[in-house]
Amino acid sequence: MEGESTSAVLSGFVLGALAFQHLNTDSDTEGFLLGEVKGEAKNSITDSQMDDVEVVYTIDIQKYIPCYQLFSFYNSSGEVNEQALKKILSNVKKNVVGWYKFRRHSDQIMTFRERLLHKNLQEHFSNQDLVFLLLTPSIITESCSTHRLEHSLYKPQKGLFHRVPLVVANLGMSEQLGYKTVSGSCMSTGFSRAVQTHSSKFFEEDGSLKEVHKINEMYASLQEELKSICKKVEDSEQAVDKLVKDVNRLKREIEKRRGAQIQAAREKNIQKDPQENIFLCQALRTFFPNSEFLHSCVMSLKNRHVSKSSCNYNHHLDVVDNLTLMVEHTDIPEASPASTPQIIKHKALDLDDRWQFKRSRLLDTQDKRSKADTGSSNQDKASKMSSPETDEEIEKMKGFGEYSRSPTF
C-alpha cells in the first residue's frame, strides 16, 4: 500500500517573534512564510510479505516576511497585485511555502476572501502545496493580563481546506533534545575549478544545460510547423466538404430535371382515349354472347386497340337498324333450343319486301332467256330498258343467291 501525509514544523523562536511583533500593533497584519518542503518515504515490511510505503511531506517554516499594512499585495476581491509581490518578495520567491494572517477576536475559520486570495496565490507561485497559517489572539481576563493565541495551518485538498498538524519545536520536547544537524555537500576545490572551466560549454548562466535549450527550441519549431500543417489540413477539409455539398446539390438538381423530363415525356406520349366503336361492341355481344374471345378486346372507330380488358359495359343501343344488319330467315340455319339460345333478329319490313321483289324479277328474266334459243337484240334491249335495275344491281342479286347468308354489319 502507498499513502501520503503532510505535517509542518515551526520553531518556538519564530512563533514567539511572530506573536510579539504583531501583538504590539493596533490592527490585523499579514505576511509570507519562508522555508522548505522535504519528502521522505517510509517502507514498512509486514509479516504478510507486503510492503507498506508511506510518503511523508514535512513543511519546515524557518522565516517570515511581514506586511505591515492590509491589502498591500491584493485588492478587496482577492486579486493579486504582481508588482507589489515582486517588491515584497524580490529574492526569496522560491522559498515561499505559504502566507499567514494575524486576526484579532475572531474564530479559526477562513473567510471567503482568504480562500480566493489563497487560490490566486497558488496560481501566481505555481505551487499547489501552498499553506495558510491563521493566528487568532484573544483576551481572556478583564484586566487584560492574560492573552490566548490560537494557531492553525490550512492546506487545500480537492477543493476543501484541511488542517495540517503543526509541531512547535522547543527544548521541552523529548524528540528535539539533540542538536539539529544539516547535511551539506563537501566539494573539493579542484572539482569546482574544473567545472567552472568547462561549464560554459555545457551550461547556461543559470545552471541549465544548453542541449536542453536546443531541444526545447526544436520542440517549439516543431509545434509551429504542426500548427501550420493543421491549419492547412483544416482548410482543405473545409474545401472538400464544400465540394461534396456542391456535388450533392448538383446531383439533386440533375435528378429533379431528369424526373421533370421523364414526366414531360410521359405526358407527351399519353394520348387521349380514342372513341370506342360502341356499335361493333354491341353487335358482338348480341350475336356472340358466349364468345369471350370476341369480348376480350375493344376497338376504336379507327381500327385501333383500346385496352386488353373485356368490355362489360352495356351501351344501351336498342336501335338495331344502325348496325345495318342484313339477315334472311331462310339463310340462317335453325339452332336447337338446347344448344344455343334464341336470338331475336330485327329486320326492316320495307327493305326485305324490296329485295324480294327484285329477286323475283331477276329469276323471270333468266327463265325467258333459257327458253328462247335465239333472241332478237331489240327484244333484249327492250327487256333491259323496261327493267329499272342496272347491271350492277343484277350482279349483286346473283351474288346474294350464290354465297352463304351470314349476318354482316
Curated annotation (Swiss-Prot):
A motif (pSXXF motif) lies at residues 406-409. Residues 362-372 have a biased composition (Basic and acidic residues). Keywords: Chromatin regulator, Coiled coil, Disease variant, DNA damage, DNA repair, Nucleus, Phosphoprotein. Changing S404P: Abolishes formation of a heterotetramer with BRCA1. Does not affect interaction with a first BRCA1 chain. Residues 7-160 form the MPN domain. Its main location: nucleus. It is found in: Nucleus. Changing F400D: No effect on formation of a heterotetramer with BRCA1. The modification Phosphothreonine is found at T390. Residues 206-260 form a coiled coil. PROSITE patterns: MPN. InterPro entries: BRISC_Abraxas1, FAM175, MPN. The modification Phosphoserine is found at S48, S386, S387, S404, S406. Residues 362-409 are annotated as: Disordered. Phosphorylation of Ser-406 of the pSXXF motif by ATM or ATR constitutes a specific recognition motif for the BRCT domain of BRCA1. Ionizing radiation promotes rapid phosphorylation at Ser-404 and Ser-406 by ATM; this promotes recruitment of BRCA1 to sites of DNA damage. One of its GO terms (molecular function) is polyubiquitin modification-dependent protein binding. Residues 373-388 have a biased composition (Polar residues). One of its GO terms (biological process) is regulation of DNA repair. Belongs to the FAM175 family. Abraxas subfamily. Involved in DNA damage response and double-strand break (DSB) repair. Component of the BRCA1-A complex, acting as a central scaffold protein that assembles the various components of the complex and mediates the recruitment of BRCA1. The BRCA1-A complex specifically recognizes 'Lys-63'-linked ubiquitinated histones H2A and H2AX at DNA lesion sites, leading to target the BRCA1-BARD1 heterodimer to sites of DNA damage at DSBs. This complex also possesses deubiquitinase activity that specifically removes 'Lys-63'-linked ubiquitin on histones H2A and H2AX. Component of the ARISC complex, at least composed of UIMC1/RAP80, ABRAXAS1, BRCC3/BRCC36, BABAM2 and BABAM1/NBA1. Component of the BRCA1-A complex, at least composed of BRCA1, BARD1, UIMC1/RAP80, ABRAXAS1, BRCC3/BRCC36, BABAM2 and BABAM1/NBA1. In the complex, interacts directly with UIMC1/RAP80, BRCC3/BRCC36 and BABAM2. Interacts directly (when phosphorylated at Ser-406) with BRCA1. Homodimer. The homodimer interacts directly (when phosphorylated at Ser-404 and Ser-406) with two BRCA1 chains, giving rise to a heterotetramer. Binds polyubiquitin. This is BRCA1-A complex subunit Abraxas 1. It comes from Homo sapiens (Human).
